[in-house]
Swiss-Prot record:
Keywords: Calcium-activated potassium channel impairing toxin, Disulfide bond, Ion channel impairing toxin, Neurotoxin, Potassium channel impairing toxin, Secreted, Toxin. It comes from Hottentotta tamulus (Eastern Indian scorpion). The record marks Y36 as: Aromatic residue of the functional dyad. This is Potassium channel toxin alpha-KTx 16.1. It is found in: Secreted. Its main location: secreted.
Length: 36
């Protein structure tokens, strides 16, 4: 799922995704975080 977190690198999304999905899985796509 795309979340409303801006990013440059995928590792910026891991903590944000952990809060949302409970998993450290995500990547930066079009400067926005996508969680798995």
């Amino acid at each position: 799922d795309l979340i409303d977190v801006k990013c440059i690198s995928s590792q910026e999304c891991w903590i944000a995704c952990k809060k949302v999905t409970g998993r450290f899985e995500g990547k930066c796509q079009n400067r926005q975080c996508r969680c798995y």
